[in-house]
Amino acid sequence: MNFTVGFKPLLGDAHSMDNLEKQLICPICLEMFSKPVVILPCQHNLCRKCANDVFQASNPLWQSRSSTTVSSGGRFRCPSCRHEVVLDRHGVYGLQRNLLVENIIDIYKQESSRPLHSKAEQHLMCEEHEDEKINIYCLSCEVPTCSLCKVFGAHKDCEVAPLPTIYKRQKSELSDGIAMLVAGNDRVQAVITQMEEVCQTIEENSRRQKQLLNQRFEGLCAVLEERKGELLQALAREQEEKLQRVRGLIRQYGDHLEASSKLVESAIQSMEEPQMALYLQQAKELINKVGTMSKVELAGRPEPGYERMDQFTVSVEHVAEMLRTIDFQPGTSGEEEDEEVAVEGEEGNAGPEEERTDGRESTGQH
């Protein structure tokens, strides 16, 4: 069935156009949305310029970069539902554009520019029966047709229905489809908003965990530095004690050597005395001194291996291996780890005291 196209478009009647226009009015400027149109997290729409004006009014201390650009950050309330809108660093330019509303505005303006009276005069005319209007719908072939085609034409054996009935039915179906599409777009926009919030949460949680990780390793480094200092001090004390002992022995041996050398020198000079009487006057005393000096017992020398310091060797291989096994613990938050570390610290502090107590009790029993 061929026919001449001349039917009214979906938005052709004035009542539908008026209803649609009401849905396209901005709640701020009370005029039709001007591009770009932004959608808020609460799913209401605003002209971006109007959103900028609302933001400026709600944040008087924030200055615009220019007449049309708002500073990043800040917040304001939706004029329709009073829901608080939090802006990111892009300001109102970070809000999503509602391309669906912008497209509907374009369609509305195109339809509004067409004369309604000329559209009302157009009709579908049957090409096989030129004087017959298309007034019925063939349900079997799913095409509009005329009454003559049903009576003795190509659709005489088909099931038909009044054209207005099918028109209302399919218009209702299309309207429902549009509503579902719009609702689906709203849901998609809501999901996008949620996922953007998830991205922000991921970034924030990652930043916090990085900070905690740095703190943990800085704490480990501090413990290692503290322990290294303690061990170095112990090594230095042992070194000083041994050096003092050995140097004391050196001084003692040196004093004995000096006294012995002087006595030897005196004895040699006495032996060179040619007069026997003078020699004998000094000989007895020198003989006694030499005998006494030879019997002096000096302090013992350091025992073999006294100079060794290998008892201060530290084995860190097992600690290094343990450090290499440090890994993340899924499901454990930073706060829980802090509590665990605090509990372990308290138990560690109590341990030595308990050991000392046990030691005293054991000593008492023996």
UniProtKB/Swiss-Prot annotation:
GO molecular function ontology, one term from the record: zinc ion binding
Compositional bias segments (type: Basic and acidic residues): 353-366
Location of the region described as Disordered in the Swiss-Prot/TrEMBL record: 326-366
Annotated GO CC locations: cytoplasm; microtubule; Z disc
Q: Mainly resides where?
A: cytoplasm
Which segments does the record annotate as B box-type zinc fingers?
121-163
Recorded superkingdom? Eukaryota
Q: Where are the transmembrane segments?
A: none
Q: Where is this region: Mediates microtubule-binding and homooligomerization?
A: 168-211
In this entry, which stretches build a coiled coil?
185-258
A Pfam family: zf-RING_UBOX
N-terminal signal peptide: none
Ranges of residues in domain COS: 271-329
Q: What is the annotated quaternary arrangement, including any partners?
A: Homooligomer and heterooligomer. Interacts with TRIM63 and probably with TRIM55. Interacts with tubulin.
Q: What is this protein called?
A: Tripartite motif-containing protein 54
